[in-house]
Amino acid sequence: MDHVLNPEEKVSQTNSESGGADGAFQHVKGEHSSPKLSASEKSLPGNTKSPLKRKAAEPDSPPKRPRLEEGHGSLVVTHYNELPETGLEIRSQSRIFHLRNFNNWMKSALIGEFVEKVQQRTRNITVLDLGCGKGGDLLKWRKGGISKLVCTDIADVSVKQCEQRYKDMKRKSRNERIFEAEFLTSDSTKELLSEKYIDPEIKFDICSCQFVYHYSFETYEQADTMLRNACERLCPGGFFIGTTPDGFELVKRLEASDTNSFGNDVYTVTFEKKGKYPLFGCKYDFSLEEVVNVPEFLVYFPVLVEMAKKYQMKLIYKKTFREFFEEKVKNDEQKMLLKRMKALESYPAAPNTKLVSGRTEDYEHAQKMVENGQIKLPLGTLSKSEWDATSIYLLFAFEKQA
């Protein structure tokens, strides 16, 4: 795989055919303009003035919160607890094998970038993995040479699997020094982690929250509690990093749809209605190939930026997956990692193998590159359906101010 098909190359070709309406990595137009909000939706419950100004000025001690209902948290727990463990052989046969690897590569590049930043001031790195799942990022932290990792998730089965993965990794490491680890089952949208740490005074250099934070936007209280858990124990100069669906992109695609749903054969997003998008509790159902629907909530990113100021957090960047990919793929080390992780599919398919998508139109962008005759084969790409699915996400990074 000597040439990596850049999404921008794909977009430019797709746009030339479709008039630029639906490129796989198209930017949201008018990104700084908010989705349509009713007057009542521009305020949070109990506020008579701008909620964002009020939140930024709130004291460090949180206000007394009303008792929250169970909400959708139990659905999320059930969903992730019931996901079966599958081996590499089974995963490699999946329609979204390369898509999953691509998203995993994005996390690797993001985590690696900020571990390097922290290493410039300390080698004794402590990390909070907020929404650790089954431990998919353990090897990334091992590669980063961190000293301590706290893993927490709402799903108890996932936390147990994460802990077992850690024990297996440590057992196989022989003489290699492996970071210490702590495992907590907790709903980080409703419970304070600071009351559960083994070391009550622990401080973190990095909090990583991958494909999880959007679950907290069910209510302001939940989003604020999760943000507090992510940020309140960060050292000055520490980072809160993560990946989350891009609310602007989701709304743009919904508004362009004739129904309350959009997607393709890989993913589907379904909203209850269109036209009004409250700041919190804007629920939609997201389904990915081979994965049952699970409710998620729209994240209006400017609100997150304002809320983070309460915890002395400053946004240092927000990038779409397209932007981040274009930046990182220029790095030879990241490009090699992309290949090792099988994050892109080889095109044309190798002898005696098939492309993951049977639809010819899914590879029109790659075929055009081949027809140009100016690249060395095979090239690395994703099917158009997979590019469309992964392009709903963005990456973010906040820094704790002194």
Curated annotation (Swiss-Prot):
Binding residues annotated for S-adenosyl-L-methionine, in chain numbering:
107, 131, 153, 187, 210, 215
Annotated region (Disordered) at 1-75
Q: Mind naming one GO cellular-component term on file for this protein? A: mRNA cap methyltransferase RNMT:RAMAC complex
Q: Which GO terms describe its molecular function?
A: mRNA 5'-cap (guanine-N7-)-methyltransferase activity; RNA binding
Q: Which CDD domains match?
A: AdoMet_MTases
Which intervals carry biased composition (Basic and acidic residues)? Answer: 1-11, 55-72
For the keyword Transmembrane helix, the answer is no
Q: Which keywords describe this protein according to UniProt? A: Methyltransferase, mRNA capping, mRNA processing, Nucleus, RNA-binding, S-adenosyl-L-methionine, Transferase
SUPFAM superfamilies membership: S-adenosyl-L-methionine-dependent methyltransferases (SSF53335)
Domain mRNA cap 0 methyltransferase, residue spans: 94-401
Q: Does the keyword Signal apply?
A: no
Which reaction(s) are listed as its catalytic activity? a 5'-end (5'-triphosphoguanosine)-ribonucleoside in mRNA + S-adenosyl-L-methionine = a 5'-end (N(7)-methyl 5'-triphosphoguanosine)-ribonucleoside in mRNA + S-adenosyl-L-homocysteine
Biased composition regions of type Polar residues, renumbered to the chain: 35-50
InterPro entries found in the cross-reference section: mRNA_G-N7_MeTrfase_dom (IPR004971), mRNA_G-N7_MeTrfase_euk (IPR016899), RG7MT1 (IPR039753), SAM-dependent_MTases_sf (IPR029063)
Q: What is its main location?
A: nucleus
Family affiliation: Belongs to the class I-like SAM-binding methyltransferase superfamily. mRNA cap 0 methyltransferase family.
Query: What protein is this chain from?
Result: mRNA cap guanine-N(7) methyltransferase
